[in-house]
Regions:
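Conserved nucleotide-binding/hydrolysis micro-motifs of P-loop NTPases
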Residues: 27-29, 59-61, 80-84, 105-110, ...
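Canonical P-loop GTPase G-domain recognition
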Residues: 91, 96-101, 105-166
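Conserved phosphate-donor/acceptor-positioning beta-strand/loop module used by diverse small-molecule
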Residues: 75-79, 101
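Nucleotide-state-sensitive switch-loop elements of NTP-binding domains
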Residues: 1-63, 70-76, 84-85
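Long, well-ordered amphipathic alpha-helical subdomains in the mid-to-C-terminal portions
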Residues: 140, 151-193
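Generic recognition of short, well-ordered alpha-helical segments
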Residues: 33-36, 66-69, 88, 111-115, ...
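Short beta-strand/turn micro-motifs at beta-sheet edges
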Residues: 9-10, 65, 86-91, 126-130
Length: 193
């Protein structure tokens, strides 16, 4: 099971690249927006030598936050021009974001994307500073024209340099390992009784 056709349709170039591996995992029946064994899959990919691992959730909502306990960088991707950019976002998800990207910033949507980015930047100032000490950035992106991808990579690289220098990266990895162990024990107990 999985959305292999949908994934490959959206990732024409990436899906055929010799250095990439795409593993669709159905999340049906599990909360958190990710499949039950996503954490284990991440560890396997790291062991296989993949240095950049992307985990896509099923959507945005309060239940799609489990992925935050599994990843080193939480990127929130939003569409502009839907009319309720900020109203539709749960506070908890915005507080988790290490970066926010406004997608489809092209054609008639460019100004809407810039406005949405401005709204998100303003909203981020209302939240307490993240434990990492990092100030999340808000960028725009056009997949159609390929505009903004360099800026997104630069943001991610800047984030990793920042959190590795201040020790937060290692602290976060330790927290992830503890959370994974806790969840594994809970899952085993639920399945046993």
């Amino acid at each position: 099971k999985g959305s292999i056709l949908g994934d490959k349709t959206r990732m024409e170039q990436l899906s055929v690249h010799p250095n990439s591996f795409i593993r669709p995992s159905p999340s049906a029946g599990s909360l958190g927006g990710v499949a039950r064994k996503t954490r284990e899959t991440i560890i396997l990919c790291e062991a296989a030598g993949f240095d950049k691992i992307f985990v896509e959730t099923v959507g945005v909502g309060q239940s799609e936050t489990a992925v935050h306990s599994m990843v080193d960088f939480f990127l929130l991707i939003q569409l502009a021009g839907t009319g309720d950019e900020l109203q539709g976002i749960k506070r908890g998800i915005m507080e988790m974001a290490d970066g926010i990207v406004i997608n489809k910033a092209d054609g008639n949507n460019i100004e809407k994307a810039k406005l949405a980015a401005s709204h998100f930047r303003n909203a981020l100032h209302l939240f307490p500073a993240p434990d990492s000490g990092w100030s999340p950035k808000v960028l725009t992106y056009s997949g159609f024209y390929g505009l903004g991808i360099k800026e997104i990579w630069d943001m991610v690289d800047e984030y990793f340099a920042f959190v590795k220098a201040n020790g937060y990266f290692e602290q976060r990895r330790n927290e992830q390992a503890k959370y994974w162990m806790y969840e594994s024990i809970n899952e085993h107990l639920r399945d046993s009784f």
